[in-house]
């Protein structure tokens, strides 16, 4: 079955966006080869439409054009670029080529399919907090994304200074579910600095990206870790009514930690969409379920109350945490609902 056809309004918007991109391309500053210096290595600090900020090996960041032959360029890409002998309209060079990526962070896009948003990530830092609430479902969604992308996760629970002793014990018990699965878990407070040295050590010599819903303190943590002072990543107050903050960043950007290591701050990872995945990919994304895949009595087992279900039997024995089992089914149900809203069938992915 084919994907649902775009409405006339959607077709007009797609066409208008295409024409606007063409117009921007035509207005780019063009370089003659004689105007350019020798090829150099660099890393993409940020991407702005038809331009990119490139950090050279000398640490200087220059805004560059992008060769039309480059089909994909995102923050974190390692590139070959050439500086101009002089700046033209604020542009200081051109990106010539992109090195192969060892990892790429993607998110699903309704119009463009799977869209890359960052490259060469070593780990995804999943930031959660006890306020507005501790959501294991959100943590599990991020873990499925990490496992699917094959990028190592690090769970960071923020705002622990707001916990009393009894609440701390309950939260610790919840985190033990992930520790038992060999996931790294850190309990921190950007306010009291508790756990910050351990977090700095986990970030050293790696390229990380922070993920988490608004209001969990990602920007506050980054400001503290980066020691930005007055040059801060924007932080919004948490809404008194909803308990949720607002978006605080607009473009992906790479920053260097003073203690070593890098971080890509990206608005595209507030919440990973999973609707493009197949149910089998979600099952594999729960690492404790993998050993039972293919062991059920029926091939089309839904892993609920189906007779002969190996996964449900493991849950009943206590080999699979009830919380994780329930979140697994919640994720599958939410994927079905999103696909229905977006007009996809189960065979369209």
Swiss-Prot record:
Required co-factors: Zn(2+)
Cofactor comment text: Binds 1 zinc ion per subunit.
Taxonomic path: Bacteria, Pseudomonadati, Pseudomonadota, Gammaproteobacteria, Enterobacterales
Organism this protein belongs to: Pectobacterium atrosepticum (strain SCRI 1043 / ATCC BAA-672)
Gene3D superfamilies reported for this sequence: Nucleic acid-binding proteins, P-loop containing nucleotide triphosphate hydrolases, Probable gtpase engc, domain 3
Protein name (Swiss-Prot/TrEMBL): Small ribosomal subunit biogenesis GTPase RsgA
EC number: 3.6.1.-
Keyword Manganese: no
HAMAP family, per database record: GTPase_RsgA
Annotated CDD domains: YjeQ_EngC
CP-type G domain span: 102-272
Residues that coordinate or bind GTP: 158-161, 212-220
GO biological process: ribosomal small subunit biogenesis
EC class (word): hydrolase
Function text: One of several proteins that assist in the late maturation steps of the functional core of the 30S ribosomal subunit. Helps release RbfA from mature subunits. May play a role in the assembly of ribosomal proteins into the subunit. Circularly permuted GTPase that catalyzes slow GTP hydrolysis, GTPase activity is stimulated by the 30S ribosomal subunit.
Subcellular location: Cytoplasm
Similarity comment: family membership: Belongs to the TRAFAC class YlqF/YawG GTPase family. RsgA subfamily.
Xref: Pfam families: RsgA_GTPase (PF03193)
Principal subcellular localization: cytoplasm
Keywords: Cytoplasm, GTP-binding, Hydrolase, Metal-binding, Nucleotide-binding, Ribosome biogenesis, RNA-binding, rRNA-binding, Zinc
Subunit structure of this chain's protein: Monomer. Associates with 30S ribosomal subunit, binds 16S rRNA.
Stretch list, region Disordered: 1-29
UniProt-listed PROSITE patterns: ENGC_GTPASE (PS50936), G_CP (PS51721)
